[in-house]
Amino acid sequence: MQPFKRRALTSDDDRPYADTDSMPEVDLDVDRRRQYMEQLNIFDDVSSGAYMLELEAAENGVKYDEKEDLLNVQIPPKYEDQISDPDGNRMIILNIYVENFKSYAGKHILGPFHKNLTMILGPNGSGKSNVIDALLFVFGFKAGKIRTKKLSALINSGGNYESCSVTIMFQMVKDMPVENYDKYEVLTDNCVCITRTINRENNSKYRIDDKDASQKDVQELLLRAGIDMTHNRFLILQGEVEAIALMKPTSKNPNEEGMLEYIEDIVGTNRFVAPISKLMHRVSLLEHKSSQYGASVRRHEGHLKVFEKAMVIGMAYLNTFNNLNYLRGIRVKHNLCRYAETMRDAKMSLVTRTGELEENKDIMLEAKDEVRKKETHERSLNSIVTELENKRIDWQSKKNDWHARDAKRKQGLKSCTQDLGKLMKERDEARREKFEIETAPENARISKQNMQLEWDQLKEQENVCQRTATENLIKYDQKSSADRAKHDDLEKKLSDELLQSMRAKAELDVSESELKDMTIMMEQGQKRVDELKGTLQTMMAENIRDNTELNAVTTELQDRKLKFDKAVEKLPHLKSTEQLLRSKKYELDQEVIEASNTQEVTYRHQATAKLHELKEAGLFPGFKGRLGDLASIPIKFDTAISTVFFAQLDYHVVQTSDECRIGIGFCHEYKLPRTTFVFLDHLKDTDTSGMDSTMKFPAERLFDKIHCVNPEIRREFYFLIHDILVVDSLEEATRIDKKYPGRHRYCTLNGSILNRSGALTGGGKPTTGRIRNDNNPNMSGVKKVDLSKLRAAQEKHNHALEAHLKLQLKQEEIRADNGPIIKQLEIRKRELIMSTKEQKTRIAELKSSIAAHERRMVNYREVTVEDLDEKRAQIADLKRQVEESQKSSAKIKQQIEQYKRKMDRMFMELVQKNKDSIEQAKDRMGQLEQDIARQTAIIENNPSHLEQAEKKLSELEHMCLEKRSEADALAQLEVGEDVKGIDIINAQLQTSTASIDAQRARYTEAVAARREADAAYQTTVDNYNMVKQTYDELMRIIDDLENKTMADNAELDIIESAWMQPEKLYPPGKFVRYNDPDIAAKMTDGHVVLPYECISMIEPHREAYEEHEARMLEDDVFEDTANKICKLEKDVDKFRREFDNKGVRDYAMIVSLLMNEVTSAKKFSDKLKAHREKLNELRMARFNEFSEALAFLGTTTQMLYQLITNGGDASLKFVEEGKSTDPFDGGIKFSVRPAKKSWKLIENLSGGEKTLASLCFVFAMHHYRPTPLYVMDEIDAALDLNNVSLIANYIKHSERTRNAQFIIISLRNQMFEVGNRLLGIYKIDGKTYNIMVDPIAVEIKNRPILKIFEEEIKRREKLRRAEIEPEIDLSNGLSNVVIAPKRKQRRLEMLKLSDFGLDDDSDLPEFNRFPPATRRELSVEDSDEDDEPVRRRPRRQVEEEDEEDELIEEATPSPPPIVVQRRVRRSRH
């Protein structure tokens, strides 16, 4: 990755910081600083430069977050080795189980695999690679890596299979020492099986040891086992070896991987890349900003003078306004003193009038006391009348009580008849129960016999199936016999108690019924007929009174209904009128509000209002208005037209060019702001036919969205806008412009423009409100409305609405008052009608009853009090017997329950546990036992039940006879003569009525006397009111003076709050003074700091006002003050028109920007220093860690390549080593020097040489960070026989490879012959099969036969040697030729010859031995001094030595092939 370019940075010593002694430190955020710059129209080169740096970083693939804390970034620790188990344990693949996977139809077992080296061989197309695909499938690789488009294609297509699955059995093993290399210890507790299944719907499922799992769980398990799923170093497929050789030194884009990234990914230093990239970008930004902020300080110091003039004018306006406020305050204080003097005179006159008022008040109070006496007398008479009325009501109540008792006696007879009916029903029910009891024993015996027969059958089945439980059942019967006997006795006792309780309850019911009958009989008297006659007279009197009240209620109800109906009829009309009046009021209110607040509601040009005033005055009749106010547009397009045509919308429209000149003259005369006039006549000869064009445009035309009634104004809009099209975004505009290039102009909804040439304009802050929108079509904001007329109409309308509301309220009160009364009267009327009807019916019934009683009157015996007491005592004794019987029954039930629970527990313990196998038969037997017991109880208890039923029936018949006799007796009884009581009551009622009439006459006289006293009192009240009126007039004067005083005090409060401060010159702005204690919080909230220059220019008018004492001024002084006020008001108005209200704000903003640039320059300088230190720290850490790993990998790759190629060399170095400050810029260079050749980059080698060098690099990575599993697919395809043998022997015999499991697919004999296991793959009829071969086991099995073959071979070899002895001598002579040792060979201590199966080099021929390691001039290993690399010798010396090497190599013949073959054979042992 290329580093970012550094910007020039001003040094810390010569930064142009401004003098900041009088101002605090200012630190604006980015948005607020940008806002200040835009408002002041200052170009922000800091932000623009930073934006370019952001684009540059994005192009380089840096994901940058400005808020990220890069100084405290956490770098993850170094990677740990995948197989660093301290106990030497590792996970290996034991077996692979495949089912319907690819070419494997059905179930197959691949294995067992060897713990180190397993070779897979077979013909092309037989399915060797499917073994690796099965591994990748379980490991969770995607379909593309498994050579298919989708996972469901992995299912075998030869049969109708719905799914396929692969299971890998992993086994934890511990390697034995070297002498027992082939042996290992299996740790059975750590074995695991991973299964993955896929179906036709592409649904995949993982299982770990037959438990559902996720892919994440599988990958975590593999990672714990040491299989690196992140870098996939364990997997080397066809062609991937050469891919290493084709890698560039470093990647040029994120989609490819270079040698540097490949190594960093393995080493782990890639964790430094992202933080270093972010820090480099951050340093570039900080360098740019620190430099640019220093330059901004110098620029803003020059801007101060530009904004100072407007600030001075604003402060002059502030001082003039405060002087005016000061003089107004003095005038108000003068008025307050004058009002106080006038109020003293008024209060003295008030004292005189107060005495007269008190005198008249005493006279009025005496008259009022007389009225109160009359009222007291009136109330006393009224209370007497009320008391007499209450007495009459009491006598009436007694009369009603007498009638109620008579009705109760009638009810007694009715109750007696009902009781008789109930008793007869109970008697019939008892007869039916008796019949059932009589027939129950025979039915019970039949049922018992049938159930006993069934029980015997079930018992026989139970005995057959439950012989093992018989003894326990016998034990249970023996142990529970005593308790069962007690239980039966208690049940019998309980039955007796319940029978006794039932009898007592029956006697109690009979006694209570007799007591009730006796009470009813005792209440019967001998005066029944007299009582009925009295009731008849009372009922007739009530009937007359109710009829009279009914007539009065009917009359009042009709009158109130008439009033209520009229009110209800008027109210709807009144309410509709009210709605109209309120709507009109709302419209007037809105017009007043709109006229008053037009400037706040919408945008208005400062000259528009004045021009409208001139038009209304008749001075400027041709003025039409501001162009933006003469049309409207939907609010969606407001931003687009207001931003693009904001200047044109402020044009002021007139009719002719002469009126334009008149308007310009008015602007000069009244010093109005600069504006543009446009006249409509210039469009008469202009072709505007296109505004109504029917042509179809590729997007909406902005002109079509404008709503305008006046056709001339509409033409003016078209002349300015033409056919510009409006779209949502610039992307859409660009897309349409490509389709119709150069044909239209486009504008976006936020105000950006795409011209016909393709140039973009706009992009600034969007503007709104320059034209009316359709949501507020009546909002003009330009025409000055006569507020006085509007407010007068508003007040008049309010009075009309108030009068209407009073009328409506009166009608609603009539409705509200009469509505409830009408409902009450209607209810009362219905009650009286029902009462009169009932009274008529009752009168007829009473007359008939009186006649019947007079005919049937007979004598009967009365029930005495002694009889009642005797019956009550008998009932109490029966209740006591019932309670005692219930208590005894409850106690017996508790004992029965205890015995029952005891037997149940015994049964559960002894029997129930042994009967689970015959539960159904046992349940049925238990049910039958209960039914038999129930039938037995019916048979045994039948006599007692029958006796009870007969007794109950007899009792009920007896009670029926008694109740019938009683009812007959009551029916024949008649009330005797007893009218004396009712006569007395009637007499008392008449006496009470006469007394009430007399007292009412006296009460009427008292009312007349009270009214005369009221008239006299009213005369005194009138006199008092006349005096009070004079008193109130004085009070009104005083109140008026107090109100004026209050108003002036309020004006003083306004003056106190009206003092102008610099903060009020621009109300929308928020300011804070430099001495404010909360300045930091307010600055954070967006406040602008007021400069010291502004505050120092404030004149002390407020202090002078506060020191001025309140007093009356002399006339000439007061007049002079008034003149000064008039002059100052004109000056204030002049300043208001001339000064820019944003002047102080702009000056404060430029000062704040200046202080912010000073603060930012210091802040970014400090940040830059800290980030540079952090960047250098991370670069050094990355370089040190990577250099250490690179040195190891380079040395190991070189050593392996030298050993395997017998004279070759390899090197891994930085491309930019010694040329750049950042060696990572150029990447890693993999250079190789094959035997007898020159140095070349690996991509320039032949295919076999690339493969050999890449494999050395792969094995070097295994040395650096080993992994327990390697899967290789035909890595030897490009190698010759010799190199294949060397690679195979290295994999098998190296100590470094013994701690890993290799699964290799190969078609080369030299490779698979060294395998510890051979997995043969073959195909029959399109289906793949396999066979696993153990070469060692086969060799042991065939050893006797091989011994015979070897002896025969030796005999024949001896004969052959005798024939070709000359050739052998020649071969031995050639074997003594020694190849010159390679000079400057590096001594390698990390690998040993034992890795290749050799104890030392004495077993090798002399030409294959290691040269003495005495010369290391070209070594890249570190020296002992200061850990610095040894410098290379001069280029000329190296070239001379290379020439010597070439001469020696040319003079040295190659060894014969037989020597190499011998070395290979020796290395196998």
Swiss-Prot record:
Q: Where in the cell is it found?
A: Nucleus; Chromosome
Please give the Pfam families that the UniProt record associates with this protein.
SMC_hinge, SMC_N
Specify residue ranges for compositional bias: Basic and acidic residues.
9-18
- Origin, by domain of life? Eukaryota
SUPFAM superfamilies in the cross-refs = P-loop containing nucleoside triphosphate hydrolases (SSF52540), Smc hinge domain (SSF75553)
- Keywords assigned by UniProt, alphabetized: ATP-binding, Chromosome, Coiled coil, DNA condensation, Nucleotide-binding, Nucleus
- Annotated SMC hinge domain residues: 621-736
Q: Which residues bind ATP?
A: 122-129
Q: Name the segments for region: Disordered.
A: 1-25, 758-781, 1404-1469
Q: Name one GO biological process term.
A: negative regulation of gene expression
Coiled-coil boundaries: 356-542, 805-974, 1016-1056, 1159-1182
InterPro entries from the UniProt entry: P-loop_NTPase, RecF/RecN/SMC_N, SMC, SMC_hinge, SMC_hinge_sf
Residues that span the membrane, as ranges: none
Q: Which GO terms describe its molecular function?
A: ATP binding; ATP hydrolysis activity; sequence-specific DNA binding
Here the segments flagged for biased composition (Acidic residues) are 1439-1449
Q: What is the effect of changing residue 128 to E/I?
A: Loss of function
Question: What follows loss of this gene?
Answer: RNAi-mediated knockdown causes derepression of X chromosome linked genes in embryos and in larval stages L1 and L3. Leads to an increase of 'Lys-16' acetylation of histone H4 (H4K16ac) on hermaphrodite X chromosomes. In the TOR complex 2 mutant background rict-1, suppresses the growth delay and elevated body fat index. In a sex-1 mutant background, leads to high XX-specific embryonic lethality.
Entry remark concerning the domains of this protein = Consists of two putative central coiled-coil regions flanked by putative globular regions at the N- and C-termini.
Family per similarity comment: Belongs to the SMC family. SMC4 subfamily.
This molecule's function is given as: Central component of the condensin I-like dosage compensation complex that associates specifically with hermaphrodite X chromosomes to reduce their gene transcription throughout development. Its strong similarity with the condensin subunit smc4 suggests that it may reduce the X-chromosome transcript level by condensing the chromatin structure during interphase. Involved in the recruitment of the dosage compensation proteins mix-1 and dpy-21 to the X chromosome. Might be involved in the reduction of histone H4 lysine 16 acetylation (H4K16ac) on dosage compensated X chromosomes.
For this protein, the record's PANTHER family field holds: STRUCTURAL MAINTENANCE OF CHROMOSOMES PROTEIN, STRUCTURAL MAINTENANCE OF CHROMOSOMES SMC FAMILY MEMBER
Q: How does it assemble?
A: Component of the dosage compensation complex, which contains the mix-1/SMC2 and dpy-27/SMC4 heterodimer, and three non SMC subunits that probably regulate the complex: dpy-26, capg-1 and dpy-28. Within the complex, interacts with dpy-28, mix-1, dpy-26 and capg-1. Interacts with dpy-21. Interacts with dpy-28; the interaction is required for dpy-28 protein stability and dpy-28 association with the X chromosome. Interacts with smcl-1.
Its protein name is Chromosome condensation protein dpy-27
> What high-level taxonomic lineage is stated for the organism?
Eukaryota, Metazoa, Ecdysozoa, Nematoda, Chromadorea
